[in-house]
A protein has these predicted regions:
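Short, aromatic-rich amphipathic segments at membrane interfaces
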Residues: 384-409
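Active-site substrate-binding loop specific to GH73 endo-beta-N-acetylglucosaminidase modules
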Residues: 20-26, 160-209
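Post-cleavage N-terminal segment of exported redox proteins
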Residues: 32, 56, 60-64, 82-138, ...
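C-type cytochrome heme c attachment motif
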Residues: 3-12, 35-36, 51-58, 73, ...
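Axial heme c-ligation environment in periplasmic c-type cytochrome domains
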Residues: 31-47, 58-82, 103-107, 183-194, ...
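Short, solvent-exposed loop/turn and secondary-structure capping segments
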Residues: 12, 18-23, 65-68, 98-105, ...
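Sequence/structural segment immediately N-terminal to covalent heme-attachment motifs in c-type
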Residues: 1-13, 18-25, 118-122, 132-162, ...
Length: 453
């Protein structure tokens, strides 16, 4: 269950300690630090009961207060009782306690540092109910749906957000920006989504992180594959692939062919590029913004001068590649800035980061060279684009409005929290009156059944 829910990818300690916390999650509102979830009584969840654990995982309410939805509890609300129990037992009794907390703490700007605002947000966007174990267990009729929408929480990254940063269910899995990267459309649409992928290709991608002629995982997807998907068995991987192949298609009106097929025609071999006299510091020369020279110096040794990559595709082709042929340049820029690191049972893949070797102008220049020669030539990148992508991409509308309205917007946000929280209380009273639901102060223990009160 910990693998399926991808707990390790976010809760990994900065020193690589499993579940020790400290990993920084870049959210639209700022940096959120994942906590220690080992059985340490002082720093982790060692003092939590199973009911408290279930409440935190499903409702985002821990013994210490409200969690932020960087912890995907709106998706985990669907976890079955049996899987909650299995996850609790594993984390409580099978993990070595880490006796220290993260070195930094979450510190979001006002008013988002007021966690009580989550009462209103949760009333709108965290209303899921546990699924039945009989349907979601291996071989169950809803196994694929469960792995995609609940344990895998794919929508947390791949579904666009609305103005209040809740998932826009009308565009489920249609693609969204996450921390500078772009989590692509994974609906069944053959042009904008994964409809052109076979089930077997999807399984290979989940297992290895790479499908030649399609895509190579980087960023958060590489983490999800390394720590989670690559450890699932074939039955579960096929269940995920089958479900995604049946997700209603959503077409992006601006795309006319799949991202991996944008530049299928190979141009003539490039002319030799005169690099002049090169020194170890030459890449940091901010005056050199010639894309061809930068590509030859920084990229061609691995991806080859013609962009074809190596024969075994250990260093991938820049043609038929979603990073270069996608609807926007975010993943190309982020791969250059952050590099790539991915380790699975099939091997290790890496690309160095050029964040400190190239200026924003140079990253833009080499990105444009790659796009024009090997990828989606309709795109272009400026230095300001690179700077914005490095900073996490375009700010959500809510933050942009707050920047303009300042105090009024802050007051509105606080008012929203109060109104939505009041609405939640009214709905809770109605549920209690109907005598079929528990109060927020009580969550059934494993095996306990709710009865009318």
């Amino acid at each position: 269950m910990a693998r399926m829910a991808d707990c390790a990818a976010c809760h990994m300690g900065n020193d690589g300690t499993p579940f020790g916390g400290g990993h920084v999650i870049e959210s639209p509102l700022g940096s959120i630090v994942a906590p220690n979830i080992t059985p340490s009584r002082q720093f982790g969840i060692g003092n939590w009961t199973e009911a408290q654990f279930a409440r935190a995982v499903r409702r985002g309410l821990s013994p210490d207060g409200h969690l932020y939805p960087a912890m995907p509890y709106p998706a985990y609300a669907g976890l079955s009782d049996e899987d909650i129990h299995a996850l609790y037992v594993y984390l409580k009794w099978s993990i070595v306690p880490v006796e220290h907390g993260p070195s930094v703490e979450t510190a979001l700007p006002f008013p988002f540092n007021l966690r009580t605002l989550m009462v209103g947000w949760n009333a709108l966007y965290a209303r899921g109910k546990p699924m039945k174990h009989a349907d979601t267990a291996s071989g169950g009729s809803k196994r694929g749906e469960y792995l995609v929408t609940v344990t895998g929480h794919c929508g947390s990254c791949h579904t666009p957000r609305n103005i209040l940063l809740g998932e826009d269910q009308s565009r489920q899995l249609a693609g969204a920006s996450v921390g500078g990267w772009f989590a692509p459309n994974i609906t069944s649409d053959p042009i904008s989504g994964i409809g052109g992928w076979s089930e077997d290709e999807l399984v290979i991608y989940f297992r290895t992180g790479a499908v030649v002629g399609k895509s190579h995982a980087a960023g958060g997807m590489a983490d999800a594959i390394e720590h989670g998907l690559s450890h699932l068995d074939d039955d579960d991987l096929h269940a995920i692939a089958r479900h995604l192949k049946n997700v209603p298609p959503i077409r992006d009106a601006n795309t006319t062919q799949p991202a991996y097929g944008v530049a299928s025609a190979r141009p003539a071999p490039p002319e030799p590029v005169d690099l002049g006299v090169r020194t170890p510091d030459s890449l940091t020369d901010a005056t050199d913004t010639d894309g061809a020279r930068l590509y030859t110096a920084a990229c061609a040794a691995c991806h080859q001068a013609n962009g074809e990559g190596t024969a075994d595709q250990f260093y991938p082709s820049l043609y038929a590649n979603t990073a270069t042929g996608g609807p926007n340049p975010q993943n190309l820029v982020m791969a250059i800035v952050k590099g790539v690191r991915r380790s699975t049972h099939s091997g290790f893949a890496s690309m160095p980061s050029f964040e400190h070797e190239l200026t924003d102008d140079q990253i833009a220049a080499v990105s444009n060279y790659v796009l024009n020669r090997f990828g989606n030539a309709s795109l272009s990148v400026s230095a300001s684009d690179v700077s914005a992508i490095k900073a996490g991409g375009e700010k959500p509308l809510l933050l942009r409005l707050m920047g303009r309205l300042d105090i009024a917007a802050m007051a509105g946000a606080l008012g929203f929290g109060g109104l939505a929280g009041g609405a939640a209380i009214l709905r809770r009273k109605e549920r209690i009156k109907a005598q079929f639901a528990p109060s927020p102060e009580h969550l059934p223990e494993q095996g306990e059944h709710l009865t009318p009160r």
